[in-house]
């Protein structure tokens, strides 16, 4: 009974965003999925055994994809038409951990977030978060095959739990400078780091933080899960914590999306429950992405479906469908991002990463409008 009351409180808080979801839903747009790389043979165009449970994916303005391989502790590079094109990058671990578990990653175009090794110092080209509670930077001029540890919060304790669990990563700028934002799923906050990798603030949605569907102990609440910078604002997904606050608990309606400014102020509740099911990947579609052009797309890890929302109102518009009118469902869906018009593919093609078969395997692929 107590759990039911807590759930009702959450629903009441987000009642207004929920109403237009059903009323505004459209039939999903038609799209074609193409499997590009997998760790398994005969599953995609190319095979790469390093691609196990890939999460985040990012690219430079004209470069290839950088993909975080959670299952192998690596980051691998792919173009839109080929398998790995450069040596894999090893993500560092904290003490006592054998293999890193990278999650979100971002491309860094700034001169900040400098890393150093053997008297060589350069700004990170790519930055990686991990479930081990670390953040690392990579620049081939510092080390061609290893990222450099910059943040280690693996031993930090809070509310009876030890070790940050970073699920997502975003980079955003404000008048105060350039900052990294990491979703710490274990502690239920978004952590903000300055240009020198110093932790300067943390924030969350106080409504969700004070309403936990499973009272515990320990209490299981909705915590920041995925994160993406869209139009200079931070879009943050929330998923339900498991008992040890490490993994999500999937299920229909288990998800929210909020929008924050770079100072951590909640701007609005963007999307709530409905078709959300442990949402993680987020992207803003371009003007030539078919039915869902210019809309925000959010991928569910829980059921592999991709939801589309009006970018202004957050109204649910439908889910991406294949040519037969069936909802596209990608088992273990994680990252979503559009190409760059260069080595990372067409700008109107949505690329994805997924850890299918309960995260035991990996898939990197593309979805384009028919």
For the regions a language model picked out, list residue spans one by one.
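Bacterial N-terminal signal peptides that target proteins for export
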Residues: 1-11
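Bacterial N-terminal signal peptides
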Residues: 9-20
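Signal peptide processing junction and immediate N-terminal pro/mature segment
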Residues: 21-25
């Amino acid at each position: 009974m107590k759990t039911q009351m807590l759930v009702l409180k959450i629903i009441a808080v987000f009642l207004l965003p929920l109403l237009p979801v059903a009323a505004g839903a459209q039939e999903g747009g038609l799209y074609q999925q193409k499997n590009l790389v997998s760790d398994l043979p005969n599953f995609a165009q190319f095979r790469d055994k390093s691609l196990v449970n890939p999460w985040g994916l990012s690219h430079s303005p004209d470069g290839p994809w950088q993909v975080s391989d959670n299952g192998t502790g690596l980051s691998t590079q792919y173009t839109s038409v080929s398998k790995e094109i450069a040596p894999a990058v090893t993500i560092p671990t904290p003490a006592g951990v054998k293999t890193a578990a990278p999650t979100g990653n971002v491309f860094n175009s700034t001169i900040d977030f400098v890393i150093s090794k053997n008297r060589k110092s350069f700004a990170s080209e790519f930055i990686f978060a991990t479930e081990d509670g670390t953040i690392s930077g990579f620049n081939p001029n510092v080390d061609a095959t290893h990222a450099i540890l910059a943040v280690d919060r693996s031993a930090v304790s809070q509310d009876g739990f030890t070790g940050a669990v970073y699920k997502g990563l975003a980079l955003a700028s404000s008048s105060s400078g350039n900052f990294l934002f990491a979703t710490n799923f274990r502690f239920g906050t978004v952590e903000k780091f300055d240009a020198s990798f110093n932790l300067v603030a943390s924030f969350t949605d106080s409504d969700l933080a004070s309403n936990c569907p499973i009272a515990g102990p320990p209490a299981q609440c909705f915590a920041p899960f995925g994160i993406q910078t869209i139009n200079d604002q931070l879009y943050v997904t929330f998923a339900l914590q498991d008992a040890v606050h490490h993994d999500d608990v999937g299920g229909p309606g288990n998800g929210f999306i909020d929008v924050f400014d770079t100072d951590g102020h909640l701007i609005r509740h963007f999307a709530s429950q409905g078709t959300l099911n442990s949402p993680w990947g987020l992207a803003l579609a371009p003007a030539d992405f078919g039915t869902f052009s210019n809309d925000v797309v959010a991928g569910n890890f829980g059921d592999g479906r991709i939801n589309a929302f009006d970018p202004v109102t957050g109204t649910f518009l439908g889910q991406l469908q294949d040519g037969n009118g069936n909802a596209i469902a990608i088992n273990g869906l994680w990252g979503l991002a559009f190409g760059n018009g260069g080595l990372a593919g067409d700008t109107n093609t949505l690329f994805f990463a997924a850890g299918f078969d309960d995260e035991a395997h990996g898939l990197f692929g593309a979805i384009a409008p028919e």
